[in-house]
Design a protein with these regions (language model features):
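N-terminal targeting segments with Sec-dependent signals, encompassing both cleavable signal peptides
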Residues: 1-212
Length: 212
């Protein structure tokens, strides 16, 4: 009855405690059982701001978990700083995502050999992002067949756009345009030029989203 009379949990608990002073059985046998259930959902979660994350990377990186480390890396511009964070995530958590992202950073630094070596450490070889990065390395090495197979297996938007690049290199311009459509990239503009859609190419070049 007490549980129904009071909607405020604090008031309800106070009244139950008052009852327990009168009813010894209630206090000894029933209340302890219900009390234990209260702590199961008592979870604390620290959600750092971007500024706090960057500060912690510099001052106390050891307290950051895998998710915080990966997020922190996206906030930094310098490749060396990103590599430091990804190395920490790899060392502490054996993070596949950190391994793949480290390989991407190395590719952006045009260090293909090290990127290849790092990417090979990925445990889940079926991961779409692993396959996409594998395709990029193959493309950089001029192996179009291997790149095409990896991008097809990845089956994500980035890989689809990369397949468009493969199609351009193979001279399959309409197929490239189909793959690149909607990316608003320089590659989409190029595919439009190669298929004689000059007005479309001009419009894309006005506000292309990436330097690719």
């Amino acid at each position: 009855r007490v549980l129904q009379m009071y909607s405020d949990p604090a008031v309800r608990e106070k009244e139950i405690k008052n009852m327990s002073q009168v009813y010894t059985t209630l206090k000894k046998d029933i209340l302890p059982e219900h009390r234990r259930a209260r702590f199961i959902a008592n979870i604390e979660f620290t959600n750092y701001t971007n500024e706090e994350l960057v500060a912690l990377v510099n001052d106390n990186i050891e307290i950051l978990d895998e998710e915080a480390l990966l997020r922190a890396a996206t906030l930094l511009k310098e490749n060396d700083a990103k590599l430091t964070i990804y190395n920490k995530a790899i060392d502490k958590f054996n993070s596949d995502r950190a391994i793949i992202n480290k390989a991407v950073v190395l590719l952006n630094m045009n260090n293909i050999a090290d990127a290849t070596s790092v990417l090979a450490q990925t445990a889940d070889k079926n991961c779409p992002f692993y396959q996409n990065s594998l395709g990029v390395i193959a493309l950089r090495n001029g192996d179009l067949a291997k790149a095409e197979a990896a991008f097809a297996k990845a089956n994500i938007d980035a890989a689809k756009a990369n397949l468009g690049v493969v199609n351009i290199l193979k001279g399959e311009y309409q197929a490239a345009l189909n793959m690149l459509k909607g990316t608003q990239s320089f590659n989409e503009a190029l595919a439009n030029i190669l298929t004689n859609n000059l007005d479309a190419a001009s419009n894309i070049l006005k506000d292309a989203k990436c330097p690719c």
